[in-house]
């Protein structure tokens, strides 16, 4: 048995997680002062990923029922990290807050993905008769 709403939510959370991972890679690169100069291409990638997250995060969190618990931290990360180059100018406290907030959002999205996958597996093992019987 398949649930279209469940599949949609799973797709949404998977895409969000991929974008949060890409954002993390660029943030980490920006914070590493030993790395070479930040390229225009890296800044463009960062801006594109950040724009995608800004456009989609509220919708995705609302669809997943996580708006109240993750929206503030997500916006904190997206507002604090305005460019890869700007990462190098953050104070140690700002970096810690950024990392903590990023981890919080990423963890919540990961947990949601795990719950959705478990529900998908549960549904896959059900027959149509079982599904309607257990409603």
Predicted regions and their residues:
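Conserved non-transmembrane functional hotspots
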Residues: 1-135
């Amino acid at each position: 048995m398949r649930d279209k709403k469940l599949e949609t939510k799973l797709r949404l959370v998977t895409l969000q997680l991929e974008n949060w991972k890409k954002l993390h890679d660029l943030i980490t690169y920006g914070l590493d002062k030993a790395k070479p100069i930040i390229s225009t291409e890296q800044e463009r990638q960062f801006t594109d990923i950040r724009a995608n997250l800004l456009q989609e995060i509220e919708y995705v969190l609302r669809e997943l029922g996580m708006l109240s618990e993750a929206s503030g931290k997500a916006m904190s990360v997206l507002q604090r990290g305005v460019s890869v180059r700007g990462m190098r100018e953050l104070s140690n406290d700002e970096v810690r807050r950024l990392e903590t907030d990023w981890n919080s959002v990423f963890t919540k999205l990961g947990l949601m993905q795990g719950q959705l996958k478990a529900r998908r597996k549960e549904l896959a093992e059900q027959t149509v008769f079982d599904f309607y019987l257990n409603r």
